[in-house]
Amino acid sequence: MWGDSRPANRTGPFRGSQEERFAPGWNRDYPPPPLKSHAQERHSGNFPGRDSLPFDFQGHSGPPFANVEEHSFSYGARDGPHGDYRGGEGPGHDFRGGDFSSSDFQSRDSSQLDFRGRDIHSGDFRDREGPPMDYRGGDGTSMDYRGREAPHMNYRDRDAHAVDFRGRDAPPSDFRGRGTYDLDFRGRDGSHADFRGRDLSDLDFRAREQSRSDFRNRDVSDLDFRDKDGTQVDFRGRGSGTTDLDFRDRDTPHSDFRGRHRSRTDQDFRGREMGSCMEFKDREMPPVDPNILDYIQPSTQDREHSGMNVNRREESTHDHTIERPAFGIQKGEFEHSETREGETQGVAFEHESPADFQNSQSPVQDQDKSQLSGREEQSSDAGLFKEEGGLDFLGRQDTDYRSMEYRDVDHRLPGSQMFGYGQSKSFPEGKTARDAQRDLQDQDYRTGPSEEKPSRLIRLSGVPEDATKEEILNAFRTPDGMPVKNLQLKEYNTGYDYGYVCVEFSLLEDAIGCMEANQGTLMIQDKEVTLEYVSSLDFWYCKRCKANIGGHRSSCSFCKNPREVTEAKQELITYPQPQKTSIPAPLEKQPNQPLRPADKEPEPRKREEGQESRLGHQKREAERYLPPSRREGPTFRRDRERESWSGETRQDGESKTIMLKRIYRSTPPEVIVEVLEPYVRLTTANVRIIKNRTGPMGHTYGFIDLDSHAEALRVVKILQNLDPPFSIDGKMVAVNLATGKRRNDSGDHSDHMHYYQGKKYFRDRRGGGRNSDWSSDTNRQGQQSSSDCYIYDSATGYYYDPLAGTYYDPNTQQEVYVPQDPGLPEEEEIKEKKPTSQGKSSSKKEMSKRDGKEKKDRGVTRFQENASEGKAPAEDVFKKPLPPTVKKEESPPPPKVVNPLIGLLGEYGGDSDYEEEEEEEQTPPPQPRTAQPQKREEQTKKENEEDKLTDWNKLACLLCRRQFPNKEVLIKHQQLSDLHKQNLEIHRKIKQSEQELAYLERREREGKFKGRGNDRREKLQSFDSPERKRIKYSRETDSDRKLVDKEDIDTSSKGGCVQQATGWRKGTGLGYGHPGLASSEEAEGRMRGPSVGASGRTSKRQSNETYRDAVRRVMFARYKELD
């Protein structure tokens, strides 16, 4: 059949009824071919429809009689007469009337039964009158099963060794419901070869009274090992003496299947992959008299070593050099070894339950009150051998792989658990693998632990270190090849090997389907990755690193802190509860007074002892976990400085960037990548360097971008805890977590705040400069990063406790009450309303004034200044960011009639209507003043006008209609931008055009404007005109022109008349030599009236005007005419 290359006559699988199937000769037309060697017997499974004697593994249940040499029995495929129990021909022990020679136990040694090397005639065990082999206690004809030379019965080298016995319509005869002794342990309604949880009676092959072994037409079924309380029952259900084939209550453990190698081609009773068959090679068997056909009742020890098991009857259907499964094991549930040598001392049979082949009504899972089908029962029965492990089965080449069920046993695990769909517990606990899903097949979880429960979280062990997240997620595919959706990779960073990777599915069904489809393994980058379920409870959450840590880890894999300590510290950091207690004693406050430089050294320790209740910073929390011996000395101070650089306050947001401070300017990114290679895998694209260009006082910074905040924290902690300290190119580098705070926020100078507190406070008390102003203002705004110390307030001269809200006088060392000055807020508001951004000259003047006043007031405390002057100092502008300037409130102008043309003028001028209204306001002519006050007034007016062109709230230049990111850029734009200068000049011209138009209007009224001819002459002749500023080319001067008389004009032609009317003379002005014009008196006859311009006004655009100016002038003139 399947898998056999030899051509043979095949009858196909039997399709009749159960009774006809085992009729004594339904397939006797095909005698079994003789086997030439013992090796051929490995493939001689005699099944129905094969060339050899048809013998169905599932339809017989007689005692094993073949291949005793291999510690098992065979019913067919012998070189000589075959002991076929289904109708084989020739002499032998045939249970169905076949004339076959007796069963052979294949060349056993002295301690084994041998059914091969005998010369004795084997009786027919079914319908013959030959020597009986009585299994019911009768004294049958002596028949030696040990030293026979007759060929042994083997069913392995036959053509039908791959018959599928699963798809039959009707299972063979039953052990329970039939009165015949059949060898079919598969398709029955009852349980099968179940040797656990049952009261197994022994098989007694001696002291029987009947003379023949008829296993077919009996009133009582043959093998009933169940529901008997240890009573010894023969093959017909009769009680007898001590039993031979007892699988329970033995003192010595029997062979175990644990630690075997699974044969990949085992035959199955149902055409599936099976474990190896029972192997009795090298077993110790009791001596048997070769002259008798009955089993000698051995001692208990011998019986246990003999390995005589009910399963041996099933082994007879297989060869004995390759392992085969036991009764009912039709699902390939074991992993077996190729050989069994001396493993008869396996698990004791006390751990087993007996099997019932006849009258049992439920499978091994009696406690579940569920009756399984024949296949399920046999699969359950198979699990029983995990504990007993007494038998080997051989020959898995003839397996039918069409309907396999991947339930298997891993004997390497303790207890030899069986893997089912539901990841059931092992059978010693009384559970079945098919309780929940008993209809599902093809489940193979042989790579996972048996106790694990399915969960949505699957752990991948052995993932390549360089595997990306996309490669890992794409490795999970649906059956149609599509990537699995809604997959989440838990805490994985490319380039780091944590030993495992966890993938979370959105649905439990998806996770189970993944395990089923991949059978516990997955290929990622040509590397096999192991899959296993992981309970979510196995992970614990590190609040400090914000990462899930494996349950097997007692410390965080990122911050390296213990689980308990990390959680405790994080609770304090995340949820600080400062207690507003009373001010400590003066001696406790003394360290915070930077009166002497010597106070700086014990400051951390004393502060830590006296202000434990006001810890809000991580630096203080870290000190609490240090031993007292480490809280002293320069090492502790260096650690405090290093911790202060980290910037890990609870106010800081998560950051993925590490900052390296004080590196060399010449350090390239490659060096940083190389130095950090032992701790993190980087590329030069992850490193940025900001070089110091301010001289020796500045620092060069390096920034390293990582994948997550937890990873950045981990690297920062590692680098900060190095001893010796972390250095690059021989220079010690400060490492901290980069926070994205601006310089005017709480992060400003945060790296200097704690370590240099003493120095700053010392300068502050002396009244010193910008640092004191900055620090006091920062603390006054509540942005001081350290909340566990007193803050010097330069406005009062006292030290301020921001938590308690009290002031402390350093001189008296007592608390003082400072009343709030009611005048301060108003003056601060006035200062906020003062314009702080002026033009170029005003900005310089303001800066010079501030610098001068700062030098003058240095050395005097703010408290004294306020006491004497009663106003805020001028340096307050440096204490905080410059606020946006509010426009100076002016009294609203009186309402006036607004012409709609004003909007049009605003559009042309590029300004708003509001600004145009201000421009239209005509101030009265100023009274004559002295030069100096007039100059000062003009400058103030100029500054006010420029302020009107700037919106300090929106940081926008209204003149250029541009907005800027900050105030400094806006000021630079006003001072340096050419565009702003051009627009400002145009704006000034527009403002001046008012006076110019008024002057022109007066001239028009006085009749001083000339006509069109006068304009031409003025352009060509009047070189002294102030409006004439550019002449591209000069023509002849007035001295070159020859004034002609009226007589020269020829009036006879029309052209002459025209020339005469316009003032030209004949012969002049027509060529290049006489381009002159007639006198102005001759042009007075021109009609004056409305033209391009207003009546009596010239329409000429002035030479210094742009087109926009000209249009504005004309429109303004028309507006005046309307008034």
UniProtKB/Swiss-Prot annotation:
One of its GO terms (molecular function) is DNA binding. It is found in: Nucleus. Pfam families: G-patch, OCRE. Ubiquitous in adults. There is a cross-link at residues 36, 331, 386, 453, 469, 569, 871, 879, 887, 935, 948, 991, 1019, 1042, 1046, 1066 (Glycyl lysine isopeptide (Lys-Gly) (interchain with G-Cter in SUMO2)). The keyword Ubl conjugation applies. Changing S353F: In a non-small cell lung cancer cell line. Residues 79-97, 115-131, 145-237, 245-286, 301-323, 332-354, 366-391, 431-454, 597-654, 742-754, 843-860, 934-948, 1004-1051 have a biased composition (Basic and acidic residues). Residues 356-365, 772-787 have a biased composition (Polar residues). The modification Phosphoserine is found at S17, S240, S360, S362, S891, S1022, S1025. GO terms for cellular component: nucleus. This is RNA-binding protein 6. Residues 1-391, 413-454, 574-654, 741-787, 827-948, 1004-1106 are annotated as: Disordered. It comes from the Eukaryota.
